[in-house]
Design a protein with these regions (language model features):
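Conserved positions in beta-strands of structured domains
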Residues: 7-10, 75, 80, 92-96, ...
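Catalytic strand-loop segment that frames the active site of acyl-thioester-processing enzymes
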Residues: 1-41, 46
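Beta-strand residues in well-ordered beta-sheet regions across diverse protein folds
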Residues: 21, 92, 106-108
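Hydrophobic core residues within well-ordered beta-strands of beta-rich domains
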Residues: 3-5, 89, 103
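Hydrophobic beta-strand-centered segment that forms part of the acyl-chain substrate-binding groove
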Residues: 54-90, 124-126
Length: 155
């Protein structure tokens, strides 16, 4: 993940829900350009935070069964408020439907009691080895690496 959009996972109930947060620091690189006179967290990064939290929930739910989780669709995306420097995005996501190849997630990002972003996400699941058996060792590496990253986010 080039842009890690979660600082900490505060609660996780595998198979059900996750809560996490992302603090918008005043020195974030993107704030210089987005926007110079009114710096705010880009909406796409707010959506990315929802997606990343959702992926951790799926991984924990399935015991890191799949090495690759990809956003297939973002439905009903609503941006309702800005995230300015020194504000914290409180993220919550819940599993609505868990299928063999996809998961439907309902996610929101709030600042305090105000919803800033909400969406329903369709996330696809797979392993690299399902397309090329020679990549099975990479699947194992990725699952182990991601398990270590989750441990850091929950400690």
């Amino acid at each position: 993940m080039r842009f890690k959009q979660l600082d900490k996972i505060t609660e996780m109930v595998p198979g059900e829900r996750i809560s996490a947060f992302r603090h918008v620091n005043a020195d974030e690189d993107y704030l210089r350009d987005h926007f110079p006179l009114f710096p705010v967290m880009p909406g796409v990064l707010m959506l990315e935070a929802l997606y990343q939290a959702s992926c951790w929930l799926i991984r924990a739910t399935e015991g890191f069964e799949n090495s690759v989780l990809m956003l297939k669709e973002a439905k009903n995306v609503k941006f309702a408020d800005f995230m300015e420097p020194n504000q914290t995005l409180l993220i919550s996501a819940e599993i609505l439907k868990l299928e063999q190849d996809t998961v439907l997630i309902k996610a929101t990002g709030s600042k305090g009691e105000t919803v800033a972003v909400s969406a329903r996400l369709v996330i696809g699941k797979s392993n690299l080895a399902s397309r090329n058996e020679d990549l099975e060792s990479l699947d194992v590496f990725l699952r182990d690496f991601l398990a270590g990253q989750l441990a850091k986010l929950t400690s």
